A protein has these predicted regions:
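N- or domain-start disorder-to-order transition segments that initiate the globular core
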Residues: 1-27
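M16 family metallopeptidases and their MPP-like homologs
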Residues: 16-18, 24-37, 43-45, 63-118, ...
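Short, surface-exposed helix-loop/turn micro-motifs enriched in polar/charged residues
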Residues: 40, 61, 128-131, 135, ...
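Active-site His/Glu-centered metal-binding helix of metallohydrolases
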Residues: 48, 52
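Catalytic Zn2+-binding segment of zinc metalloproteases
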Residues: 53-58
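Acidic/histidine-enriched alpha-helical segments
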Residues: 66, 122-147
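Contiguous, non-catalytic segments that form substrate-binding/exosite surfaces or channel walls
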Residues: 151
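Active-site glycine-rich loop that binds ribose-phosphate moieties when present
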Residues: 183-187
Length: 187
């Protein structure tokens, strides 16, 4: 059964809940849908989910963040980028055990919701209002390494090139994470 549990039309936010006794885990995710306009914009957006999932204002370093996730029975945070047609989808998600398996009636799902809210609305910024430089550079390097790995995986690379050629000059032809050149120029 799916219920709309939160809706804010002013910012286009809608939250749904789908409960089932079939699974032992809970997953909360936020999907930010952005138009694909240029490879540079795609590259800039592609860095955001992973760097946002590293630290927040509430959990300013990886150790504090990891400790909180461990307290929630080994919960985890996931980030990613995908593309559907002319849209780039930035995904941030938190997963953990279902509440019925927590000791003492602890509300793990509420804690996961707080963590996800913190990632989406209060990511860690430096005094200039930018992502911390070291974390940003690490995620930029990681994104470049992912593109290199795709090149070495021939089926993925062939699909990517086919899409680029079929949709050349159109938003759907822009790679979901931008191009190597665009990723290198992101600041």
């Amino acid at each position: 059964m799916t219920n709309t549990i939160l809706e804010r039309k002013d910012c286009g936010l809608r939250a749904f809940a789908c409960e089932t006794p079939q699974f032992k885990t809970a997953r909360l995710s936020a999907h930010l849908v952005l138009p694909l306009t240029t490879p540079e914009a795609a590259a800039a957006h592609a860095v955001v989910p992973n760097i946002s999932a590293r630290a927040t204002r509430e959990y300013p370093d990886y150790t504090a963040f990891g400790k909180r996730l461990a307290e929630l029975y080994g919960a985890s945070v996931h980030a990613g980028v995908s593309r559907i047609g002319d849209s780039q989808i930035l995904t941030l998600a938190a997963s953990g055990i279902a509440n019925r398996y927590a000791f003492g009636g602890e509300d793990v799902q509420a804690a996961l919701a707080e963590i996800l809210e913190s990632i989406v609305f209060t990511p860690l910024f430096d005094e200039n209002g930018l992502f911390p430089e070291d974390g940003f550079r690490q995620e930029q390097r990681q994104l470049l390494e992912t593109l290199d790995a795709e090149f070495n995986e021939k089926r993925i690379y062939a699909k990517r090139r086919c899409t680029e050629l079929m949709f050349a000059g159109e938003p759907a032809g822009i790679p979901q994470s931008g191009t190597r050149e665009a990723i290198r120029t992101v600041t």
